[in-house]
Amino acid sequence: MPSVYGDRLTTFEDSEKESEYGYVRKVSGPVVVADGMGGAAMYELVRVGHDNLIGEIIRLEGDSATIQVYEETAGLMVNDPVLRTHKPLSVELGPGILGNIFDGIQRPLKTIAKRSGDVYIPRGVSVPALDKDTLWEFQPKKIGEGDLLTGGDLYATVFENSLMQHHVALPPDAMGKITYVAPAGQYSLKDTVLELEFQGVKKQFTMLQTWPVRTPRPVASKLAADTPLLTGQRVLDALFPSVLGGTCAIPGAFGCGKTVISQALSKYSNSDTVVYVGCGERGNEMAEVLMDFPQLTMTLPDGREESVMKRTTLVANTSNMPVAAREASIYTGITIAEYFRDMGYNVSMMADSTSRWAEALREISGRLAEMPADSGYPAYLAARLASFYERAGKVKCLGGPERNGSVTIVGAVSPPGGDFSDPVTSATLSIVQVFWGLDKKLAQRKHFPSVNWLISYSKYSTALESFYEKFDSDFIDIRTKAREVLQREDDLNEIVQLVGKDALAETDKITLETAKLLREDYLAQNAFTPYDKFCPFYKSVWMMRNIIHFYNLANQAVERGAGMDGQKISYTLIKHRLGDLFYRLVSQKFEDPAEGEDVLVGKFKKLHDDLTSGFRNLEDETR
């Protein structure tokens, strides 16, 4: 069995020159200072000590370099060797990423567990990120010798799994005339499948490419995002929508359901592929994802059921893993997401949680003796967050054929004590366009998703108006009315506490009842039931339409009844006479989308018509 430790010798390889080494001068937790590093570059990858620990240079002063080590540094000694690799921290991109689980620096955890037989990652482990021996079905596109290719051109397709086609692209920095292209067949990641000639120099390419994680992958141009990210959560899709290529933040205290929302997005959103980064969260949560996702299925347009895991990549960096690797895990995840974006896919990246990432920055900053800013975080916290979120967006991809792709970033934030004035939360909110604020009080009342509809917002509502107009021309007005009802309820609550509900006007009683319908039977959603774990957008629209239709009809009936000589129409009378319709309004959420869109829309339309006729009959009876 091959060793996971690589060449753990007391000295490095004989082929290395002594000038390639530096020597450890100081060790402080994950931070190591090495001398004799003249000529090294910022963010260069190095191997530290006799165990070949992976590290990255984060500061250069003269010939000394400060290195953050991505593994446990216990046992390192002064004068241990530091080997330069002359390349930045990079990820391997190619077939085999989907369905895999990596740590923060893209080491495959399943392979390491199999080879080492241990539940923990051994120090200095050296395992390639992608399996180089697996054979993949390679199908070149209609290209031949003599054709010209430039960076980003798609030249072949690989069958990755029954859910995803993997398009093989030329690296962004390559170009030339084709001198060889492999015929269709099965190849491994070590086999040459393409050869290009440029200015008399020939270069071979495999299906694998590497890319430095801190460098955004180039695009042809950025585009305005105008397609909604449909999550299957009514409160998000209807009231606070995001777009494919948007940036979202989910701040909330512990136990508010951030992880459940992130996982629901991974399971049910209309993205083509999902990169889920567990950054500094509990190991049990990642274990839950690993157990749940392979069992979850999604129904494709042709009726096939496929495992959600086939479109998911997991980057697990749990809270007991080295702190420095948390920072790398975010960049590893976004680089993998950009790779799939460049194929023309819509990618969602979940970062759970960016607060842990910021804490890693704070710890490293403290070790470097940098001047602390608010709450001890480094002064460059906002700049780092911005550079990460800026990698989201809808783009026109580099190369041909012409295609658009997008990366949507959803970042969970865990402010201590649920305090939204925390530096990480406030810096995040100044960058992102969608704010899904979770409320501890709602969570304690078992109202999930616990998104507070009074403080949350989305800046994409205007960009999505054309989509809503095509989908349903009434929806924007209905949504505005629903928001007004919820806001009005908040205003009335203070009056109710002072004088009681009976003292209110009839229209205000109707407002409170409608708001209760919206809160308990529309915004609340049970993620663990077959009928409510995912709500298609047409169901969200029709449910809201019927609730607001009831609100409008009830108000009209009360106003008309006030001017008549007969029996006055009151809220109590409406509730008594139309109790069965009211029950059907409450029961809308129990309609199962598995019955099909036509069946459900038929039921919702019938309820809409029955509401109209029910109120008409009530008015006729009371005249």
Curated annotation (Swiss-Prot):
Give the UniProt family note. Answer: Belongs to the ATPase alpha/beta chains family.
| Keywords in alphabetical order | ATP-binding, Hydrogen ion transport, Ion transport, Nucleotide-binding, Translocase, Transport
Cellular component annotations (GO), alphabetically ordered: plant-type vacuole; proton-transporting V-type ATPase, V1 domain
* Cited function: Catalytic subunit of the peripheral V1 complex of vacuolar ATPase. V-ATPase vacuolar ATPase is responsible for acidifying a variety of intracellular compartments in eukaryotic cells.
Give the enzyme class.
translocase
The record's catalysed reaction(s) read: ATP + H2O + 4 H(+)(in) = ADP + phosphate + 5 H(+)(out)
Disulfide connectivity for this sequence is none
Q: Return any one Pfam family short name.
A: ATP-synt_VA_C
What HAMAP family does the entry give?
ATP_synth_A_arch
GO biological process: one example: ATP metabolic process
Enzyme Commission numbers on file: 7.1.2.2
This chain's protein is named: V-type proton ATPase catalytic subunit A
User: Quaternary structure per UniProt?
Assistant: V-ATPase is a heteromultimeric enzyme composed of a peripheral catalytic V1 complex (main components: subunits A, B, C, D, E, and F) attached to an integral membrane V0 proton pore complex (main component: the proteolipid protein).
Protein residues bound to ATP: 252-259
What GO molecular function annotation could you give as one example from this UniProt entry? ATP binding
List the InterPro entries hit by this protein, alphabetically. Answer: ATP-synt_VA_C, ATP-synth_a_Xtn, ATP_synth_asu-like_sf, ATPase_a/bsu_AS, ATPase_F1/V1/A1_a/bsu_N, ATPase_F1/V1/A1_a/bsu_N_sf, ATPase_F1/V1/A1_a/bsu_nucl-bd, ATPase_F1/V1_b/a_C
